[in-house]
Amino acid sequence: TWIMRSDIAPHEASKKGLDVSVCGSCPLRQAIGGACYVTLHQAPLAVYKAYKKGLYNKAVDVTRLKGRKLRMGSYGDPAAIPFEAWEAVAQYTNGNTGYTHQLNHKAFDKRLLDLVMVSADTPKQAAKYQASGIKTFRVKVESMPLLKGEVECLSDTQGISCIECKLCNGQNKSVAINVHGRGTKAHTLKYGKGL
């Protein structure tokens, strides 16, 4: 799923700092120099343009999702969408994955924790969340060890895609992945000391 504004292209929203409505307080937002991996001028922009041309139905028959796998927020934070909408969709799917940085937002709906992982930016933050029973997803520098109870992302270790793995659904184990892609340098500079 693509969570984006309908009034401005995603890459423009990011450049202007108007992506808060879809990304919340995520520290990985490109607008604030974060290491978000989403290439906004590619797939998200294509989806936005298709929407503006009227190629997306405004009403969706969620039963058509029966047996399909759901990525909650290929771009955008799932917390930007009411829990009831996700619940209505997820009941028909064959598994889901998703991540949120909004756990500490005053309006965060904790029911979402049954469907998504909480993104943790540091080992200390991950350990704090995990101690309260929350499943976390953490991007780490390769030299950093896994925390007790964490598993390494199967994409890293076995080349299994997220949608096939489905471990990141808020119900299984906490997961950590080695930083990769174009945000590696920025992430390593900000979080490389493992605080």
Task: For the regions a language model picked out, list residue spans one by one.
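Class I S-adenosyl-L-methionine
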Residues: 1-195
